[in-house]
């Protein structure tokens, strides 16, 4: 380009006829590395691992719960042993309607 503005004479186009279909190489030329460092687990090992996870889910575990007395708002701590599913049920009860009363408020109301 000569000058501040391009002109049509300065633009050079080379057109080639493209009427024929040209073949495209679709073969992947990648090579896989050694599979020695990969560990292939048999299906029974995977199933055993899933079984262990399910067994652990059903296993009783201790959980510390901190909450407030519904009467005097004192902090309460209690420990429960429950499976994960049962703990989830207890959590739903806390969210819905379950309230705890401390020992002092429990004796005063009787």
UniProtKB/Swiss-Prot annotation:
Q: A single Gene Ontology molecular function, please?
A: DNA binding
Pfam families annotated for this entry? E7
Annotated compartments: Host cytoplasm; Host nucleus
Grouped into one coarse class, the protein's main location is: host cell
What the entry says about post-translational processing?
Answer: Highly phosphorylated.
Q: Where is this region: E7 terminal domain?
A: 1-47
Q: Which SUPFAM superfamilies match?
A: E7 C-terminal domain-like
Give the location of motif LXCXE motif in residue numbers: 26-30
Tell me which UniProt keywords the record has, alphabetically: Activator, DNA-binding, Early protein, G1/S host cell cycle checkpoint dysregulation by virus, Host cytoplasm, Host nucleus, Host-virus interaction, Inhibition of host innate immune response by virus, Inhibition of host interferon signaling pathway by virus, Interferon antiviral system evasion, Metal-binding, Modulation of host cell cycle by virus, Oncogene, Transcription, Transcription regulation, Viral immunoevasion, Zinc, Zinc-finger
Residue ranges covered by zinc fingers (unnamed): 69-105
Q: Which Gene3D superfamilies match?
A: 3.30.160.330
Q: GO cellular-component terms in the record?
A: host cell cytoplasm; host cell nucleus
- Taxonomy, superkingdom: Viruses
Protein role: Plays a role in viral genome replication by driving entry of quiescent cells into the cell cycle. Stimulation of progression from G1 to S phase allows the virus to efficiently use the cellular DNA replicating machinery to achieve viral genome replication. E7 protein has both transforming and trans-activating activities. Induces the disassembly of the E2F1 transcription factor from RB1, with subsequent transcriptional activation of E2F1-regulated S-phase genes. Interferes with host histone deacetylation mediated by HDAC1 and HDAC2, leading to transcription activation.
**What family is this protein classified in?**
Belongs to the papillomaviridae E7 protein family.
Q: What is this protein called?
A: Protein E7
Tell me which species this is from: Human papillomavirus 68
| Protein encoded by which gene | E7
């Amino acid at each position: 380009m000569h000058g501040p503005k391009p002109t049509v004479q300065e633009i050079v186009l080379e057109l080639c006829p493209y009427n024929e279909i040209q073949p495209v190489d679709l073969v992947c030329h990648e090579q896989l590395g050694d599979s020695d460092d990969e560990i292939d687990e048999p299906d029974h090992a995977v199933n055993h691992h899933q079984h262990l996870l399910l067994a652990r889910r059903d296993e009783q575990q201790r959980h510390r719960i901190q909450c407030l007395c519904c009467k005097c708002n004192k902090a309460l701590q209690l420990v429960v042993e429950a499976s994960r599913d049962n703990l989830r049920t207890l959590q739903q009860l806390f969210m819905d309607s379950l309230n705890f009363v401390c020992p002092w408020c429990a004796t005063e109301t009787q």
